[in-house]
């Protein structure tokens, strides 16, 4: 519902702040003697479609060959826009009070809340059988119920997620295309499985897929799981992070 969204899509993590920061960097580099002692060239770039949202739409673009990757950063590199770059620095908004801890790693809450986790992007499709909800519900298989059961099973897994892995599973239901008096025969879900390491992401994603599949079996429904690589976990260089904090 953002007033400047295009086709219902807009960035969600303060990209206006990132753009302002880039303009500030450009202005600083134009100051007298700012580039003294430096060689080479400096390129200021922004990454469009950086957030991995609208997964079904992006997967459609990928299937058509319009894009190769669902994430803007990965697509950016694939198209060669960082070719010839020897060193890159990223500017992004942060939670107030976040910092590098004594072990040289980012604080745990910062790692989780700032989205620095890696992720697997998931498209989930439950397939049931439509029937008249009032007259013959026994002839249908409710895809919505199967999806709800699958999400409940995933919620019951949360106590098995270890805090050190900062696992996050946050699905959204994409809705059913049917009337109120019809047993829904399809329900789509989009989600991520996020984590602090690739090992943790893969391990917990297996659990999630098992829960989603088990729910379909218990209801006599079908389920299609499509997992696509998202972003790898991000780790900050502690020395450079400290330098950036001191400069601020």
List PLM regions with ranges.
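Amphipathic alpha-helical segments in well-structured domains
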Residues: 22, 42, 69-73, 205, ...
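Short glycine-rich or small-residue beta-strand-to-loop segments that form or flank ligand, phosphate
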Residues: 9-12, 192-194
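Histidine/acidic-residue-rich, glycine-tolerant segments that coordinate divalent metal ions
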Residues: 2-10, 16-17, 36-169, 177-181
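Short alpha-helical patches at coil-to-helix transitions and adjacent helical residues
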Residues: 18-23, 144, 237, 241
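Flexible, small-residue-rich helix->loop connector segments that border functional cores
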Residues: 24-41
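Active-site alpha-helical elements of protease catalytic centers
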Residues: 12-29
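Ordered, soluble secondary-structure elements with a strong preference for glycine-centered loop motifs
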Residues: 11-12, 137, 198-203
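Metal-dependent amide/peptide-bond hydrolase catalytic core
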Residues: 148-248
């Amino acid at each position: 519902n953002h007033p400047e969204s295009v086709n219902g899509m807009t960035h969600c993590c303060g990209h206006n702040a990132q753009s302002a920061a880039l303009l500030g960097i450009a202005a600083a580099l134009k100051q007298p003697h700012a580039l003294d002692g430096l060689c080479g060239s400096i390129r200021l770039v922004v990454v469009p479609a950086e957030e991995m949202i609208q997964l079904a739409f992006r997967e459609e673009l990928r299937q058509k060959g319009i894009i190769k990757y669902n994430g803007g950063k990965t697509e950016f590199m694939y198209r060669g826009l960082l070719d010839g770059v020897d060193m890159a620095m990223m500017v992004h908004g942060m939670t107030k009070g976040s910092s590098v801890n004594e072990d040289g790693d980012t604080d745990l809450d910062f790692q989780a809340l700032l989205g620095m986790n890696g992720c697997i992007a998931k498209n989930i499709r439950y397939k049931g059988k439509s029937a008249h909800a009032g007259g013959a519900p026994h002839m249908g298989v409710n895809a919505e119920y199967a999806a709800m059961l699958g999400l409940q099973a995933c919620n019951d897994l949360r106590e098995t997620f270890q805090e050190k892995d900062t696992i996050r599973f946050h699905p959204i239901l994409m809705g059913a295309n049917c009337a109120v008096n019809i047993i829904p025969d399809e329900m789509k879900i989009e989600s991520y499985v996020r984590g602090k390491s690739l090992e943790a992401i893969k391990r917990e994603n297996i659990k999630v897929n098992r829960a989603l599949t088990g729910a379909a079996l218990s209801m006599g429904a079908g389920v299609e799981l499509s997992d696509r690589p998202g972003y790898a976990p991000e780790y900050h260089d502690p020395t450079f992070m400290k330098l950036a904090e001191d400069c601020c």
